[in-house]
């Protein structure tokens, strides 16, 4: 894991130098958030045992790459992917492997969200003590029970219930 994490760290810390790349936007090191196929990369830290790094990067991306104005997205919203990353990451998870039906935990960005599902069910996501200073997940519960997995399944979400992040 350590060699992988070192390579991943270098992606976010080594600056892009040389030729000007006019269509590359949203750079953090060499990670280009404006290039949608790389959106899952920040969540690889969580899978490799460093969820706090995923949580830091998600907060940094929210703070630097999205603005509430007409040109508030870096890159462009090809097929809605920039918006999809924003919405899923705001809920605190993201599908690193979209065909697995599993979402990797990051850190929520809103204090409360409710998804209205089929058959009148809801899935509520609560981030207790969320602030810019409290951007790290301390613990998670699903329907009142401690939840320690790195991922949540699509099946668990569509059953309905309540996911609570305790932030620190």
Regions found by a protein language model. Name each.
Residues 1-124, 129, 155, 162:
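Active-site core of glycosidic bond-cleaving carbohydrate-active enzymes
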Residues 129-168:
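C-terminal beta-sandwich/jelly-roll accessory domains of carbohydrate-active enzymes
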């Amino acid at each position: 894991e350590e060699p992988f994490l070192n390579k991943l760290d270098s992606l976010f810390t080594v600056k892009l130098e040389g030729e000007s790349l006019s269509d590359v936007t949203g750079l953090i090191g060499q990670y280009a958030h404006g290039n949608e196929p790389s959106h899952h990369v920040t969540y690889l830290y969580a899978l490799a045992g460093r969820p706090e790094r995923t949580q830091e990067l998600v907060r940094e991306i929210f703070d630097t790459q999205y603005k509430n104005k007409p040109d508030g997205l870096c890159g462009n919203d090809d097929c809605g992917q920039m918006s999809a990353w924003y919405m899923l990451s705001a809920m605190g998870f993201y599908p690193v492997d979209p065909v697995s039906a599993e979402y990797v935990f990051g850190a929520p960005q809103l204090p409360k969200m409710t998804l209205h599902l089929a058959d009148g069910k809801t899935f509520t996501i609560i981030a207790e003590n969320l602030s810019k200073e409290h951007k790290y997940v301390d613990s998670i519960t699903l329907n009142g029970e401690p939840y320690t997995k790195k991922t949540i399944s699509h099946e668990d979400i569509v059953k309905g219930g309540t996911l609570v992040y305790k932030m620190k």
